[in-house]
From Swiss-Prot:
Highest rank taxon of the organism: Bacteria
Protein name: Pesticidal crystal protein Cry7Aa
Family the UniProt entry places it in: Belongs to the delta endotoxin family.
Swiss-Prot/TrEMBL GO biological process terms: sporulation resulting in formation of a cellular spore; symbiont-mediated killing of host cell
Role according to the record: Promotes colloidosmotic lysis by binding to the midgut epithelial cells of Coleoptera. This protein is not toxic in its natural form. It is highly toxic to Colorado potato beetle larvae after an in vitro solubilization and trypsin activation step.
Organism of provenance: Bacillus thuringiensis
Keywords: Sporulation, Toxin, Virulence
PANTHER family: ENDOTOXIN_N DOMAIN-CONTAINING PROTEIN-RELATED (PTHR37003), PESTICIDAL CRYSTAL PROTEIN N-TERMINAL DOMAIN-CONTAINING PROTEIN (PTHR37003:SF2)
InterPro entries, alphabetized: Cry1Ac-like_dom-VII (IPR048645), Cry_V (IPR041587), Galactose-bd-like_sf (IPR008979), Pest_crys (IPR038979), Pest_crys_dom-III (IPR005638), Pest_crys_dom_I (IPR005639), Pest_crys_N_sf (IPR036716), Pest_cryst_cen_dom_sf (IPR036399)
Chain segments annotated as coiled-coil in the UniProt record: none
Note from the entry: Toxic segment of the protein is located in the N-terminus.
Length: 1138
């Protein structure tokens, strides 16, 4: 059962059933009758555990070497380095000792494999040579540090460095002889640690020793390669050894766990600090924490019959916790039970530790978390809490005991003394048995006194409970320990690089998890869940709040995205990251090369002494794994940030120009020029006045070059819809902004539209005279955020992109200066790395999350008479759409060649063929339309309609005119197309015909252009649009439409009605005067439609002559049933000359 997944619980009262059940098996046992106490002792002595690591020189030595290495991480200073070599040499090559041989012997015993004599002898010989060379190098280094200008001292130290470096390169293969990699692993790790430390000196001092820069770089690159090589070798063979010891029995697990514990101490703890020998990445003293957990042997005498004891898998699954955040023991609540002795004459009853539960805290947190119960509480006789409350327990002394029965033996722990730096805590079930089990034997200190030099602290206790009816019973506690360096506080120092492991978080955002580490990281890893948030770390800042820090994150992933750091829930750092590997597996399978670093270019200051640091991911390229190893804080001096700004600005300005600074680089955008100018503006004029002035002049020159190459008129949007300049033309819904966090100059703000026929738009045509033949041009710009923004560049056809860009450049709360203006210098960190078009995603023609955009357009031949030009258009056609963008430019990209040249020639030919076809088609339509329009009018001046012209005929002429294509551009209906002059001419005549038609009609609103205005109607009558005309709709037989009109008495009138009946029944229009004279037109669905009226989709025009006897006439529209649609009612004088 998993006892460890308790991070989400403040307390848990559930009992964890650790009981291990085995088949009943009786065994022969000596009779206990008449046995005295001495006879009993002779039996129990045989039950004592085998000799542990008490006084083990190998273990004692490696913990001291690890301690010395941890104290000299990074670049701690020259005196530290020489003292480090002195201490290491004294530990690994003592005058009277064979430490290297003991390293081999220790591992040989653990894996039961002897090293062949020749392999051992060769390795020892190589190590002796390295020891001698180290002694000479250390003395030469110390001598040179005392007189660094002395040529002899320089020559001596350089020579000795080359000798010992060569010896290491030559000797390392002797420490990994095929077949003996595991028993030689401690030797390999110790030698690798020394070699990497030595290579650091080349980078630090090589220039002073006369090394060439190439030689220094070669040594540095070799060091980086060796860090990776040495790390992977050690973890590979550690895992191989562990796998070799995998077994099935309790005793096999004991040995398996000892190998794991001792090889962590003798190899992996050192491997975890290999990267800190890199003097460029860790350029000052460095503080780190080893968060791995080790388990001392079970607190028990040897089980008399281990074959039926707890199994290997039961021990591993129950005694060993699953990966978890680092926690700190606060309290043990222990239950005491009793084993009754078979005979008090032989031995006393055993009051023993039968169960417990653990209360613990996370790093820098006051909340207590309590596990369920380990062991068995049934029948307990007492219980109590044993509190530690920040008291580091560095040692335990225990009294494991056994009660002997004729056929069983019951194991238990009577006492445990917990030694803490703030005092001792004593669990005592009774005091009849001696404290014989000492954790120091397995986890020795780094010297005396132990309470000051201890290396590990107790962090947790698990237990195995075994019960069988007729054989051995046991409750066995197992203690787990963390390294002393993994302290409760995450201290951030003013003068040291601080590396905080990710498992020092106090909270993970569900479903982020802790996973087993690969071995070389010094602990486990945090793996992101499906959400962006990873978790929170609490830190203690041991420096003035004015201190600034750079931040670095070590990670492994096969995805790209953005890594965000929040401080006190305020986003403080953002930067893009790339994948470190192409494919990724589980955390335990990662290699050294799987990891990379996210480094932030801007510095931070902490707002208080106990900040909360939150790690967060966004914009991930896919949903694959992301592992966090650690976050690092690197202190910088007071002017560091200003110097960084200057260097960054100088580099940025230089990248704007081609060689000779006569032109801008092709990939430099107008937006980039603006952003570089902001970088220059942010340089301190007090510290770097001359440099700032020079850079300002250069960036102004760059801006002039940007303007001069831009083919767009009015790039700053000062004269939209100007009659004086043939530049931008736009609709309503556009606002011109000026100067914010993202844009230095003017920018555009587009809002959505309620009507797709009338979008929010802005366009400009680049004149043919500005273009070159067979040349590629690029439209470029920058978008802060947008939705449904469509961008077009058009020549022979349209290049079109829909641009949806997230509003993710800046935090929710933007920095301002004392005047309330945008603090661009503070905001610049968020704009440093925005996605390029190449990093964006394209789906269904929509370019997503690319703040920079670019569209190509190619020219063919140039014809100034045709003046085809290049059209540039931006529009939004949806209500939800919006956009904020600027820095628009169209620039020459270069000649069109190769396949692109063939393609543009084909496009031009295709366009010309299409244009010729369109011209022929348009001429035919024009002839038909002109003839239809001529037939409407009574004279050439189009001043009167012919008497018999109906609405349907005018509509028919209009339909012919509307069939003319390319009257307006397809991409924006307000922009005239190639047929616009012809269309305008004919449309004017159509409009004139409708006007004359309406003028002669005495029926008000007879075409229902104004809806139901002027008509008296029932509530169920409506007007709807159909085929460009308004149509009156009657759906019910009781619907009624009325209008009274005034006519000339005794004059003749003609009534024209264009209508359509659907379904059974009939529709009718009745005209009646006051004396009751009535005429009526009827429409049914089965009437034959005149082919000449087919253009209005089934509508029929009917007419009648009416001679009123009174001035007032009543017109009624109705139906008997079904649906009746009326398109037009016209009543005009017979004698009217129309």
């Amino acid at each position: 059962m998993n006892l460890n997944n308790l991070d989400g619980y403040e307390d848990s009262n559930r009992t964890l059933n650790n009981s291990l059940n085995y088949p009943t098996q009786k065994a022969l046992s000596p009779s206990l009758k008449n046995m005295n106490y001495q006879d009993f002792l002779s039996i129990t002595e045989r039950e004592q555990p085998e000799a542990l690591a008490s006084g083990n020189t190998a273990i004692n030595t490696v913990v001291s070497v690890t301690g010395a290495t941890l104290s000299a991480l990074g670049v701690p200073g020259a005196s530290f380095i020489t003292n480090f070599y002195l201490k290491i040499a004294g530990l690994l090559w003592p005058e009277n000792g064979k430490i290297w041989d003991e390293f081999m012997t220790e591992v040989e015993a653990l894996i039961d494999q002897k090293i062949e004599e020749y392999v051992r002898n060769k390795a020892i010989a190589e190590l002796d040579g390295l020891g001698s060379a180290l002694d000479k190098y250390q003395k030469a280094l110390a001598d040179w540090l005392g007189k660094q200008d002395d040529p002899e001292a320089i020559l001596s130290v350089a020579t000795e460095f080359r000798i010992i470096d060569s010896l290491f390169e030559f000797s390392m293969p002797s420490f990994k002889v095929t077949g003996y990699e595991i028993p030689l692993l401690t030797v390999y790790a110790q030698a690798a640690n020394l070699h990497l430390a030595l290579l650091r000196d080349s980078t630090l001092y090589g220039d002073k020793w006369g090394f060439t820069q190439n030689n220094i770089e070669e040594n540095y690159n070799r060091q980086k390669k060796r860090i990776s090589e040495y790390s992977d070798h050690c973890t590979k063979w550690y895992n191989s050894g562990l796998s070799r010891l995998n077994g099935s029995t309790y005793e096999q697990w004991i040995n398996y766990n000892r190998f794991r514990r001792e090889m962590i101490l003798m190899a992996l703890d050192l491997v975890a600090v290999f990267p800190f020998h890199d003097p460029r990445r860790y350029s000052m003293e460095t503080s780190t924490q080893l968060t791995r957990e080790v388990y001392t042997d079970p607190v028990s005498l040897s089980i008399s019959n281990p074959d039926i004891g707890p199994s290997f898998s039961q021990m591993e699954n129950t005694a060993i916790r699953t990966p978890h955040l680092v926690d700190y023991l606060d309290e043990l609540y222990i239950y005491t039970s009793k084993y009754k002795a078979f005979s008090h004459e032989i031995q006393p009853d055993l009051f023993y530790w039968s169960a417990h539960k653990v209360s613990f805290k996370k790093s820098e947190q006051s909340n207590l978390y309590t596990t369920g119960i380990y062991g068995k509480t049934s029948g307990y006789i007492s219980s109590g809490a044993y509190s530690f409350h920040g008291n580091d327990i560095y040692r335990t002394l225990a009294a494991p005991s056994v009660v002997v029965y004729p056929y069983t033996q019951n194991y238990g722990v009577e006492q445990v003394e917990f030694y803490g730096v703030k005092g001792h805590v004593h669990y005592r079930g009774d005091n009849k048995y001696d404290l014989t089990y000492d954790s120091i034997d397995q986890l020795p200190p780094d010297g005396e006194p132990i309470h000051e030099k201890y290396t590990h602290r107790l962090c947790h206790a698990t237990a195995i409970f075994k019960s069988t009816p007729d054989y051995d019973n046991a409750t066995i506690p197992i203690f787990s320990w963390t390294h002393r360096s993994a302290e409760y506080y995450n201290r951030i120092y003013p003068n040291k690089i601080t590396k905080i492991p990710a498992v020092k978080m106090y909270k993970l955002d569900d479903p982020s998890t802790v996973v087993k580490g690969p071995g070389f990281t010094g602990g486990d890893l945090v793996k992101r869940g499906s959400t962006g948030y990873i978790g929170d770390i609490k830190a203690t800042v041991n420096s003035p709040l004015s201190q600034k820090y750079r931040v670095r994150v070590r990670y492994a992933t096969n995805v790209s995205g953005q890594f965000n750091v929040y401080i006190n829930d305020k986003i403080t750092l953002q930067t893009k990251f790339q994948n470190t590997v192409e494919t990724i597996g589980e955390g335990k399978d990662l290699t050294y090369g799987s990891f990379g670093y996210i480094e932030y270019s801007t510095t931070i200051q902490f707002p208080d002494e106990h900040p909360k640091i939150t790690l967060h991911l966004s914009d991930l390229s896919n949903n694959s794994s992301f592992y966090v190893d650690s976050i690092e804080f690197i202190p910088v001096d007071v002017n560091y940030a200003e110097k960084e700004k200057l260097e960054k600005a100088q580099k940025a300005v230089n990248t704007l120009f081609t060689e000779g600074r006569n032109a801008l680089q092709k990939d430099v955008t107008d937006y980039k020029v603006d952003q570089v100018s902001i970088l220059v503006d942010c340089i301190s004029g007090d510290l770097y006045p001359n440099e700032k002035r020079e850079l300002q002049n250069l960036v102004k020159y760059a801006k002039r070059l940007s303007y001069s190459r831009n083919l767009l008129l009015d790039p700053t949007f000062d004269s939209i819809n100007s009659s004086e300049e043939n530049g931008w033309y736009g609709s309503n819904g556009i606002v011109i902004g000026n100067g914010d966090f993202v844009f230095k100059g003017n920018y555009l703000i587009f809002s959505g539209t309620n009507d797709t026929q009338y979008p929010t738009y802005l366009y400009q045509k680049i004149d043919e005279s500005k273009l070159k033949e067979y040349t590629r041009y690029k439209l470029k710009g920058f978008i802060e955020s947008s939705q449904d923004l469509e961008a077009y560049v058009i020549r022979y056809d349209a290049k079109h992109r829909t641009l949806d860009v997230s509003d993710n450049l800046l935090p929710d709360i933007l920095p301002e200066n004392t005047c309330g203006e945008p603090n661009r210098c503070a905001a610049q960190q968020y704009l440093d790395e925005n996605p390029s078009p190449e990093c964006s995603s394209m789906q269904d023609g929509i370019l997503s999350d690319s703040h920079s955009f670019s569209l190509n357009i190619d020219t063919g031949s140039i014809n100034h008479n045709e003046n085809l030009g290049i059209w540039v258009l931006f529009k939004i056609s949806t209500l939800e759409g919006y956009a904020k963008f600027g820095n628009l430019e169209v620039i020459e990209d270069g000649p069109v060649i190769g396949e692109a040249l063939a393609r543009v020639k084909r496009q031009e030919t295709k366009w010309r063929n299409k244009l010729a076809q369109l011209t022929t088609e348009t001429q035919a339509i024009y002839t038909r339309a002109k003839q239809a329009l001529d037939n409407l009018f009574a004279n050439a001046q189009d001043s009167h309609l012919k008497r018999d012209v109906t609405f349907a005929e005018i509509a028919a002429a209009r339909k012919i005119v509307q069939s003319i294509r390319e009257a307006y551009m397809s991409w924006l209906s307000v922009v005239p197309g190639v047929n616009h002059p012809i269309f305008t001419e004919l449309s004017g005549r159509v409009q004139r015909a409708f006007q004359l038609y309406d003028v002669r009609n005495v029926v008000r609103n007879g075409r229902f252009l104004n809806g139901l205005s002027d008509w008296i109607v029932t509530s169920d009558v409506k007007v709807q649009e159909e085929n460009g005309n308004n149509v009156l709709v009657l759906n019910n037989w009781d619907a009624q439409v009325l209008q009274n009109v005034k006519l000339y008495q005794d004059r003749g009138y003609i009534l024209h009605v264009t209508a359509r009946k659907i379904g059974i029944g009939e529709g009718y229009i009745t005209i009646t005067d006051e004396e009751g004279h009535t005429d009526q037109l009827r429409f049914t669905a089965c009437e034959e439609i005149d082919a000449s009226n087919a253009f209005i989709s089934g509508y029929i025009t009917k007419e009648l002559e009416f001679f009123p006897d009174t001035e007032k006439v009543h017109i009624e529209i109705g139906e008997t049933e079904g649906i009746f649609l009326v398109e037009s009612i016209e009543l005009f004088l017979m004698e009217e000359l129309c």
